[in-house]
Amino acid sequence: MLRMSLPSSRPLWLAALPWALAACTNVPSAPTADNSSASARPGLVRSAKAATELLAVTASMELIRFQADQPRQILQRQRIQGLAKGDTLVGIDFRVARGVLYALSQQGQLYTLHPQQGTLQAVGTGGVALPTGSFGLDFNPTVDRLRVTGPGGLNLRLHPDTGALVDGDAQQPGLQTDGRLHYATGDAYAGRQPDISAVAYTYNAQNNQLTTNYAIDKTLGTLAVQGSLEATQPQISPNTGQLHTVGPLGLGPLADVSFDISDVSNQALAAVRSLSPSAPTHLYQIDLATGRARMLGVVGDGEALLGIAIAP
């Protein structure tokens, strides 16, 4: 990837190499069992001092790149190519196990997305019909599956090699989605319909079998845990759809929000646009212990974003 004359602690060609190789090679098969306990992540060598970089999809279907400490400075802007006519992307994320950027469309088609060229390549022939609305998506690093949340409590997983729906209940005929999103009994918002439009998983460097699925409720403006915190008992799977509120972001209700957690540092970042008229998109750092958001700056010229992904 070109660094666009921005100073970096990594050589330019070395920084570009992982993405270039990932986009030009065949993706190896992932574990077929969704509850696989095998590590999905090969060893990666990275500079701990490198600035956190993000890719984002704009509402005008452009792929932009910027750094967390200077979000206003757009380092790359590329028109996204290969999307079916009338379709739009609803989110992006890097597949932790392979370092490949994935995108999901409103029509339920999964793609790989070239991080420099902005070109899409379809994965399979369409995984699932999606309702209209805002979606969250993020790869679970322990089992290499793509979590998708959306309107009406939608909660499902997609297989990254086929784009197909992962069966949420093998005991029932046909393919089932996972349990509907709902706030747990005793939660401050129990009985209220969630509006989870952003999700992200942590990465545990000491034990890669552990992860926590965090979620942001756009209507409430709150951070929640989907399932249970890693290494706590009893363990509750995100597949149940059970939500436990962490706390408010401190921003009020949101027009849109995108969310990701770094698999290097577990830094949690969210791109947020408030309900205020003509509100720009700001980048925030999220405290996973409290939910509180700390502003880092406006992203570019403040345009609306449909998804962000922290670069590996």
Located regions from the model:
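Bacterial N-terminal signal peptides that target proteins for export
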Residues: L2-W13
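C-terminal motif of bacterial Sec signal peptides marking the signal peptidase cleavage site
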Residues: L21-A23
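Sequence/structural signature of beta-propeller domains
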Residues: T25-P312
